[in-house]
């Protein structure tokens, strides 16, 4: 799984209106406990530091839909078509240009990943250490540190605004940071019974690495 896809299994959100003075941690816990599904749009960028200068690069964008626990559709629309979809048991990664599908069991891999914050169960503090991180850029921030030392990510920063997650900054074990902006988030939309069922595209090559 390439770096872009790893970062992508990282983000989606939910909402609940809370008091304006509530801290990021209270806002986020209320958001998580009150929302069983959500949809919206995302913009994803990577942070690069060259000669001491910080730049944002590799912009990608698309839409997302999720339902707890472990079901989601994360669709890249620009600059290319790629799909990450999970049905609660398996994760499907579809590259439209290659007409190629890679499948993996969700298993325990979800528990300490950024995806667990958005798509997993409500028991966040089992897998993450959470703490307030102050205010910046008009948002209240919290930090989530995975308790699993084998996690791909070392720190996840979440920006909350008016009871909604608006930004996730993901720092991986190589020191690289991916920023995901969340827009037009809608809480608890109506879902079809087979909303997250993945259908293998005609003629697609299917890989099942273990």
Predicted stretch roles:
Residues 1-9:
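Bacterial N-terminal signal peptides that target proteins for export
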Residues 18-22:
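Sec/Tat signal peptide C-region and signal peptidase I cleavage site
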Residues 23, 27, 33-88:
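N-terminal mature ectodomain segment of secretory-pathway/periplasmic proteins
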Residues 44-46, 68-70, 76-80, 87-90, ...:
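A mature extracytoplasmic/lumenal domain signature
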Residues 49, 80-82, 100, 150-153:
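Short beta-strands and strand-coil junctions in structured, solvent-facing domains, enriched
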Residues 93-119:
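Acidic/charged, solvent-exposed loop-and-adjacent secondary-structure segments enriched in E/D, K/R, S/T
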Residues 102, 126-131, 135-210:
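Gly/Pro-enriched, hydrophobic low-complexity segments
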Residues 115-120, 127-131:
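Anionic-ligand binding region
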């Amino acid at each position: 799984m390439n770096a872009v896809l790893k970062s992508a299994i990282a983000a989606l959100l939910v909402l609940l209106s809370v008091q304006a003075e509530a801290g990021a941690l209270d806002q986020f816990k209320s958001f998580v406990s009150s929302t069983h599904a959500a949809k919206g749009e995302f913009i994803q960028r990577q942070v690069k530091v060259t000669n001491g200068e910080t730049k944002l690069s590799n912009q990608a964008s698309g839409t997302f839909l999720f339902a707890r626990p472990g079901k989601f559709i994360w669709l890249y629309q620009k600059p290319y078509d790629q799909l990450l979809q999970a049905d609660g048991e398996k994760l499907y990664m579809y590259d439209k240009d290659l007409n190629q599908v890679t499948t993996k069991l969700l298993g325990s891999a979800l528990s300490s990943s950024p995806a667990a914050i958005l798509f997993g169960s409500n028991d966040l503090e089992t897998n993450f250490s959470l703490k307030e991180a102050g205010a910046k850029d008009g948002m209240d921030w919290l930090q989530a540190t995975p308790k699993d030392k084998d996690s791909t990510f070392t720190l996840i920063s979440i920006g909350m605004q008016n009871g909604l997650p608006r930004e996730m900054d993901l720092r991986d074990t190589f020191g690289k940071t991916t920023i995901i902006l969340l827009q037009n988030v809608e809480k608890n939309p109506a879902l079809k019974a087979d909303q997250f069922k993945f259908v293998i595209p005609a003629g697609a090559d299917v890989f099942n690495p273990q």
